[in-house]
Amino acid sequence: MNIDALSLDPNTINFLKSQGYTKLYPPQEDAVKTGVLDSKSVLVSVPTASGKTLIAMLATLSHLSKNKSKVIYLTPLRALAAEKFEEFKKLEKINGSKLKVAIATGDFNSKGNELDNADVIILTNETMDAMMTFQKSWIYEIGLVVSDEVHLIGDSGRGPTLEMILTRLKTGYIGKKPQIIALSATISNSSELAEWLGCKLVESEWRPVPLSEAVYSNHTITNQDRVESEGNLDKKRETRHSKPAIGLGLDTVEDGDQSLIFTMTRASSVAAATEAGKFVAEQLKKDELEKLLKISKTILPKETEDQTKLVKKLADAVKNGAAFHHAGLDQRCRTIIETEFKNGHIKLLTSTPTLAAGVNLPARRVIISSVFRFGPNGNAPISILEYKQMCGRAGRPQYDDEGESIIVAKGSPNQYLEHYVDGIPESLESQILGDSSLRIHLLGLIATSSTFSPISEEKINEFFSQTFGGLSDDKLESKISTRLKELKTYDMITDEGGFKPTKFGQKIFWLRIDPKTAFDITAYLEDYVQGNKHTFGFLHMITNLPEFYPQFGVTEKLEEKMEEIHDNFKHEKLYANQKLDQDWTKSLLILYHWIDGMTYSNMSQEFNAEPGDIFQIRQNTEHLAYIIREIARFWKNQVLVDELDTLRQRIRHGVPEKYLDLVRIKNVGRVRAKMLYKYNFHNRVDLRKVSLEKLAAIDKIGMTIAKSIKLQIE
């Protein structure tokens, strides 16, 4: 079907053509014929890179041409939301259009009343959940919902929130029932998911670039048709590396294409990129290497003390045309790598599996170095769905006539071919009725449904029976009854002719935390030790909460360090029975040294903690400290509220308490604060006394920063 045949106005058709769209892919045509332009709800279950975004865009344009209601686009990740915002922002350029696109994710937020005035809003699922919690006025104006990566309903972490959002929307619990466009990877129970959502199903295995799936074993590549070949694999090169995954990747680079290698650990990702880079560089021209040298310089932070070994290794690999990508890198580094791989400057990229579910970085050849990944319980095989998402990155539309994915096998290739290549992705299983999820969302339902009158258990059961999990669980009512009793025990709900939240329950609902965790925190605070500071005690408690992540284990080398810290801080117990010498992890050590001002390079050397890890730890810790602070405030414990306010500032800035007055000044971060303190400028009063010239002469300050400081404090 040609773009011209769509029932859209001429200006919109011309815009789509200007973006390179002339003809619809088969799944896109199927979606149009199924009714996405006619207000029909549709679940599109197709492989990666099969044009799902254009389907959402067409539905959006059609909806807004006929209705005044809003379109919301839900994504599971902030990076994906930013990507979609860039794509949908282009719609504002349609001739004669007054269309406005906004974003709300926590990292990237439109300002002021832009969400109220926007026609299209891009949100993460968690942000949408918060908007529903705060009952923003515009949520009653939603006419079309696009849910990207809807198969993540089966994810134990993010799934329950998404499931509750969709249940509320599809049942008309908030506003009118909207049109729903759900975008999913290929799953085996897509018909069940479509029926639950009230969607028609569009299902296809079609890809814009044909995919060849194969398994490598013992110098031989066996494809999905069981045809064996050596491919173009250079056995000498493979032997030189002793790692077939690298040889397979380099083979593609030699042909002038890009390759993506999935490794199962961060260390193997770094090692593979470092090793492969030496040989990638041999294939590159002088001007390509010069460009890569410039890119590598942008990777290194300006401050020497922020240059960790990991970042230096990344910069060195990039010089050679290779790179690695994992959660240990900070967002700045990851963005550079993603951009330069898309631009074609980086030829070989290694990554942990997290990239498969993240931003779209296709390559001619994808190599899966192992089908095992390390998890909480040791090594475990990846799911078929994970495998399909990885190999779905193979083949770049407009560049490749074929994409290749290759599993590196140990032993016979047959079991890999049968299980992964021929396999059907697992069925989605709802996570909404797990103990923690059910407590959170039960309290949420009661808090939002009983403004004027209590909600009955019958109504609660009726609502949860409309969730994806509630459809088939014959123990639904029993599970709900058990969790309701728990909430009453926690003094978060009352049952007097129906359920209503107590003031405490309402508070915990606003905080969006497991009621059991909130109950435990309350018990700790009631038993708090008076007269002391509790900094270490708070950090110990936070790192032991179920909601805390990422959690890193402890090595023998760190045992002695922890014992030493415990001896110094045992007087900082938060509550009487707190055992500071037990239940601690490396994450606690990282936090303690972070708020003491330790540099990134030293953190990396001492604890193997990288900037990306530290960012996640401090962000999550600050959030949990805020929750604890709000619980302390609810119980009118001002002493702990004040202490937690200070702790949160230290977590945010990564400094000792004595630097806090300095880091509150814009452009004075932890590095400059340390330098100012060294020169006896301990606070704003000291800075007011010094001349502009003397302030500018201090290392790492300079005239521009000095003027900025003076403007703020005088």
Language-model segment annotations:
Residues 1-30, 34, 38-42, 285-315:
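Helicase-associated low-complexity/disordered flanking segments
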Residues 15, 21-174, 178-186, 190, ...:
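Conserved P-loop/Walker A NTP-binding site and adjacent catalytic elements of P-loop NTPases
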Residues 73-74, 82-85, 89-102, 267-348, ...:
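Conserved C-terminal RecA-like helicase domain
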Residues 116-133, 321-324, 341-356:
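Conserved two-lobed SF2 helicase motor
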Residues 183, 190-275, 323:
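Conserved interdomain linker/interface between the two RecA-like ATPase lobes of SF2 helicase motors
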Residues 348, 355-372, 404-406:
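A short beta-strand element within the Helicase C-terminal
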Residues 372, 383-419:
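Conserved segment of the helicase C-terminal RecA-like domain
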Residues 439, 444, 481-664, 670:
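C-terminal helical accessory/scaffold domains
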